[in-house]
Amino acid sequence: ELDILSSEVAISLYTQNIEYKELASRIVISNHHKNTLSSFSEITEILYNYVRHEKSDSLINEDYYRRIMEHKDIINDKINDYLDYKFDYFGFNTLFKSYLLKVDGIPIERPQHMLMRVALSIHKTDLDLAFETYDYMSNRYFIHATPTLFNAGSNREQFSSCFLLMMSDDSVKGIYETLSDCAQISKYAGGIGLAIHNIRAKDSFIAGTNGISNG
């Protein structure tokens, strides 16, 4: 709690001196490291063996888990936790609140764990490409989009950011089927563009009900 309070005081002063922002980020990241395991494979095991309400509720998929366990020593050695300090205060807090995988509402991943999870999930058994991707992301050359960060390694590996849909039919059934599809996409962090040009115009006749469309 003292670390959190200190970081909040520091960030409140950064408009007076920009170095307070650096101090705040170092405090919150150091605090997170104190409260989490450094071993990527141990974190993976916790996520895989998670139990909710006395029922197995694995947060990662079995294929991903077995790949990690098979190569855990080389993967653990590749993680560089110091690179977490490349994130600024606001960037880290965004990861902490929304992106790092949680157990019982508490983030247990470190930022480097998240980046390695993404790299290994994308490149599967090709460790060389996975490590190259991890190196690029951890050194801030690029980062993947939100759905990839959310879903990599999970039981719902949906990586796409954007979906373009059209109303499946100009009817109550067609409209609500399309809205259901939109809800499922949104559930896993996909963005949606929806075309409704095939819906009848306002004041058009509705034969099924002998009514008039509201448009």
Describe the residue ranges of each PLM region:
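Extended catalytic cores of very large enzyme megasubunits
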Residues: 1-215
